[in-house]
Amino acid sequence: MSRLFERTAKGLVGQEQYRDIPHRSGSTDMGDVSQIMPSLHPYMGGAQGPGHAATFAIVDKQLGYVLPAKALAAMVVDLLADGAAGAREIVAKSKPPMTRAGYLTFQRSMARREVFDGASGG
């Protein structure tokens, strides 16, 4: 999927404007999704400031909103063309680290309920 996104993005913004971003720290729900199925969390420009900060702002609406939507729509077309051949190939080659059942078992094993009784100090 990353190669498909790269090809699509380069077609939209040009080779000279495309660049790979190295792995970034942080956590997203896409990390969870990627444990059970092929996934992609692409970034496109148009924003300034740290993510989730009060100073984060979209400064280029074309690059921040329109081009990402076009890229994703173009990828959907490519993935579903020819009877979804592209999507089927990605799924066939995918080797997710967990099954759905394994993921749910893991998540349920991590769940717990804690009650803090501030009145008792403990």
Regions found by a protein language model. Give the residues of each.
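Metal-dependent peptidase/peptidase-like ectodomains
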Residues: 1-15
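Zn-dependent metallopeptidase/amidohydrolase metal-coordination segment
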Residues: 18-75, 79-118
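Preference for extracellular/luminal or secreted protein segments
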Residues: 121-122
